[in-house]
Amino acid sequence: MPVMLIVRPSARAGDDMRTCSQAGWRARVLSPVEIEPDETALRGLKEQFSRADAAFWVSPTAVETAAPYVDFSDDLKAQIAVGQASGRALERCSAKNVSVPQEGNDSEAVLRLPVWDTLPPNARVLIVRGRGGRDFLAESLKKKGFAVEIAEVYFRRPNELNWQDFDAESIGAAFIASGELVRGLFAQVPPQFSRFFESLL
């Protein structure tokens, strides 16, 4: 069975592993970066969420990290997701009134959603994201007259990789989820594997 190397945080690799298995591949996960919940931010999230008229969810990780700390029973609150994966994550958490761009999965696509026109003037929008996310959406919403609050509910930490049992010859292909992970991976690649990883790019 061919092996697909998946480079992403281990908590996000489950769907990719299932996809590989269904396609007849065996998955091998390397996680040079891991996701850590920000416990301080999560303790204050319930209050932030309760006073918001709308919540914007930046990623499935944001949803899965924050959802246990909020109450989705208020169907009147608009839930806005950056893309289809985040929208599905919200629906799995029983969120209602979810708006998702049909094309695109970035802040620009989100800003084109009609849901913004349904919110009251000076509506309070909570952006739920990881630490250090883009400020483009927040600034754009402020220009539209919305009051924006940000909850940074997780952060990324470097993770030391174990190369002891790594078999480069068994890898048939690789999926690397982001540029950040490329940089984190290559910062740790041992000299004996550097040519192999360069050949994947």
Where do the protein language model's features map onto the residues?
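Signature of uroporphyrinogen-III synthase
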Residues: M1-L201
